[in-house]
Regions:
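Active-site neighborhood of HAD-like aspartate-dependent phosphohydrolases
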Residues: 1-51
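Helix N-cap/coil-helix junction residues
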Residues: 32-33, 53, 129, 172
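Acidic/polar active-site rim loop that often engages polyanionic ligands
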Residues: 20-23, 59-60, 142-148
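C-terminal cap/substrate-recognition subdomain and adjoining C-terminal extension
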Residues: 3, 77-80, 84-175
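A general alpha-helix detector
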Residues: 22-23, 44, 58-62, 78
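An amphipathic alpha-helix signature
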Residues: 20-21, 72, 76
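Short, compositionally biased "basic patch" segments
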Residues: 46-72, 132-140
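Electropositive phosphate-/nucleotide-binding environments in soluble metabolic enzymes
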Residues: 17, 39, 53, 57, ...
Length: 175
């Protein structure tokens, strides 16, 4: 009998906030993104998504696009600083307690999030969660993030599809 899965959603359950929003704010504060250009585009994409005129792929792609043009190694120092400065202080005590309760019960812990894997893998590690299902970033043949989503975004109905794929890779399926 495989262990019971404990699936955790990140935003406003384990984290006070949204990683994509926090990442963009962090990049604007560091001057990596031009606030005068990026903020209006961000507001427009969020409004379009809420209005139903922007789809999941375009929405996720907008945030994945913040990584475009650099390699994972080039982003690493900023990613680590982002984790310690913006994420760790916002990890909720109640969320950590819930994780620990499931861990004590022997459950298999899985973090599932629409934010990209590159940003959230450090968050999963900081929470002691060994499995992460997240939106994947495309990396070009030059080793740089292309700015595109790879595969199905882990958002809305894509979360069920991605969980099913994750389970199938482990010889399991949704009940």
């Amino acid at each position: 009998q495989p262990p019971t899965l404990a699936l955790f959603y990140l935003y406003h359950t384990l984290l006070d906030g949204d990683s994509d929003v926090l990442w963009c704010e962090y990049l604007m504060d560091r001057g990596v993104l031009d606030r005068a250009v990026f903020e209006p585009r961000n507001r427009a994409i969020e409004a379009g998504y809420k209005a139903g005129t922007v789809g999941v792929l375009e929405f996720c792609g907008f945030y994945v696009g913040t990584l475009a043009g650099r390699t994972p190694a080039q982003w690493q120092p900023l990613r680590e600083d982002f984790l310690h400065e913006r994420i760790v202080p916002r990890l909720l005590a109640a969320g950590r307690a819930c994780i620990e309760a499931h861990r004590r019960d022997g459950h298999e812990l899985v973090l599932t999030t629409a934010t990209n894997h590159f940003l959230t893998e450090l968050t999963a590690a900081a929470l002691g969660i060994g499995h992460l299902i997240a939106t994947e970033c495309d990396i070009g043949i030059d080793g740089r993030f292309s700015g595109a989503v790879a595969g199905t975004p882990n958002m809305r109905e894509g979360k069920v599809a991605r969980l099913s794929e994750w389970l199938a890779a482990r010889g399991r399926k949704l009940a």
